[in-house]
């Protein structure tokens, strides 16, 4: 029977069947300071060791300051998390990239750029956006703290097989439309729970045309559609991206790896539980208006009314979202003022994102009413951006250029908003209070965020691109 990409990766990692569940082997385990302390504590209490420290890599990202390299810059609680991670990694001989290390970065940015993630792998992390790594044709998903402990101890995980979903994005992307617009449009179409219980495979001409960094953006937000994971089949772009990276295979091992990677595709006639079709030509620059990523519209579309939704749950959700966001049905996004802009995160903190935002930023100055920060996703991204002069473009335009970290994506460090603030953000979640209690978050692409910084409102980025 014809197999999907998901079938192939899943079946290659089954160790044993436990009733209806499978015990699968984990190839790569990424850890950070927030979800690992309790896991290591459990390990130590039971007198266990980390089974495969060589397959485990740690970084500091969530709780760190983007203003200072001091480990205690975000207060004693955050400092304790960071110190605990360092202690645990040292005791268990795990490679750690701490604050200030040249390879440190957001876990889902530094992992790929080091070549730690490769096609056909199983990848887990105590973080919901682990799906990012599916861009390489890896089965990657977030896990809870108890599961982190289990993987540390056994390098395995008990899992039930998910359903499969194929999402085809047909045709070429129009000028000015980005990977962020693709994934927001997908979530807008199927809903923020539309892929619950599924692993998504993204395909179609528009997806094949994306760079590896753009594919990471798409896969990153699979969880916002409710999915377990998101995948893109590896191709020549994947191989070119990985070749020569620090942890990628070398010599004959590389040749053997590529030969295997080329078998990782969905075979003709393979069956999916669900198939979704989108036309790339229909996608406009996207902006979320509500409090979940599925509440999203094109930048020139009026804010919807609750009556526009037939589902009673969606209707009630719209009522609450409009109230929280301080919006009225029929309003134009171009009339809505923004006072904060955040460019960064594991969704859009890579070098191509920095370049896209800088292209818009150089066309103006940050509006007097706006505070705008740019946070590179890793030390490598920061150095590359500075080598290209992007930092100067940003600072000359009035943006703040920060140190790498998760930053304003979540209210877990010192980059927070206050009640009533309205932020154009390149992150992945617009939940109530995500960026600070009472703060209002609108998800957009890096270019759209830069345009919002300049205009002080939501503007169609296509008007600001050459």
Curated annotation (Swiss-Prot):
This is 3-isopropylmalate dehydratase large subunit. It is an enzyme of class 4 (lyase). Heterodimer of LeuC and LeuD. CDD domains: IPMI (cd01583). Its cofactor is [4Fe-4S] cluster. Keywords: 4Fe-4S, Amino-acid biosynthesis, Branched-chain amino acid biosynthesis, Iron, Iron-sulfur, Leucine biosynthesis, Lyase, Metal-binding. SUPFAM superfamilies: Aconitase iron-sulfur domain (SSF53732). It comes from Alteromonas mediterranea (strain DSM 17117 / CIP 110805 / LMG 28347 / Deep ecotype). GO terms for biological process: L-leucine biosynthetic process. NCBIfam families: leuC, PRK05478.1, PRK12466.1. Binds 1 [4Fe-4S] cluster per subunit. Gene3D superfamilies: Aconitase, domain 3. Coiled coil: none annotated. Its EC number is 4.2.1.33. Belongs to the aconitase/IPM isomerase family. LeuC type 1 subfamily. Pathway: Amino-acid biosynthesis; L-leucine biosynthesis; L-leucine from 3-methyl-2-oxobutanoate: step 2/4.
């Amino acid at each position: 029977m014809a197999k999907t990409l998901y079938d192939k990766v899943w079946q290659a990692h089954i160790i044993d069947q436990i009733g209806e569940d499978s015990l699968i082997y984990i190839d790569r385990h990424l850890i950070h300071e927030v979800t690992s302390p309790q896991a290591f504590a459990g390990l130590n209490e039971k007198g266990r060791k980390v089974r495969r420290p060589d397959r485990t890599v740690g970084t500091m990202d969530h709780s760190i300051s983007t203003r200072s390299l001091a480990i205690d810059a975000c207060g004693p609680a955050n400092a304790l998390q960071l110190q605990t991670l360092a202690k645990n990694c040292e005791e268990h001989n795990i490679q750690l990239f701490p604050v200030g290390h040249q390879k440190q970065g957001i876990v889902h940015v530094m992992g790929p750029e080091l070549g730690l993630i490769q096609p056909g792998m199983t990848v887990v992390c105590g973080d919901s956006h682990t799906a990012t790594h599916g861009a390489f044709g890896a089965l990657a998903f977030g896990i809870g703290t108890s599961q982190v402990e289990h993987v540390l101890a056994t390098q395995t995980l008990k899992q039930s097989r998910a359903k499969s979903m194929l999402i085809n994005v047909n045709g070429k992307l129009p000028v000015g439309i980005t990977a962020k617009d693709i994934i927001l449009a997908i979530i807008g179409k199927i809903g923020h729970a539309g892929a619950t219980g599924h692993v998504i495979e993204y395909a179609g001409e528009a997806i094949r045309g994306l760079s590896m960094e753009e594919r990471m953006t798409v896969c990153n937000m699979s969880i916002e559609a409710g999915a377990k994971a998101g995948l893109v089949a590896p191709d020549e772009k994947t191989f070119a991206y990985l070749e020569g990276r620090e942890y990628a295979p070398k010599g004959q091992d590389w040749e053997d790896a590529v030969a295997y990677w080329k078998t990782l595709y969905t075979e003709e006639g393979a069956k999916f539980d669900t198939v979704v079709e989108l036309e790339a030509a229909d996608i406009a620059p996207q902006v979320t208006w509500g409090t979940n990523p599925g509440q999203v519209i094109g930048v020139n579309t009026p804010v919807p009314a609750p009556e526009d939704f037939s589902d009673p749950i969606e209707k009630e959700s719209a009522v609450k979202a409009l109230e929280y966001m301080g919006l009225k049905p029929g309003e134009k996004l171009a009339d809505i003022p923004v006072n904060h802009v955040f460019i960064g995160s594991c969704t859009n903190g890579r070098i191509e994102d920095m370049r896209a935002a800088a292209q818009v930023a150089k066309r103006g100055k940050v509006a007097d009413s706006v505070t705008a920060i740019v946070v590179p996703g890793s030390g490598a991204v920061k150095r590359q951006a500075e080598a290209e002069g992007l930092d100067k473009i940003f600072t000359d335009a009035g943006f703040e250029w920060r140190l790498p970290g998760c930053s304003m994506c979540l209210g877990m460090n010192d980059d927070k908003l206050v009640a009533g603030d309205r932020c154009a953000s390149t992150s992945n979640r617009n939940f109530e209070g995500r960026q600070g209690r009472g703060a209002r978050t609108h998800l957009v692409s890096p270019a759209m965020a830069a345009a919002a910084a300049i205009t002080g409102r939501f503007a169609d980025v296509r008007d600001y691109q050459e």
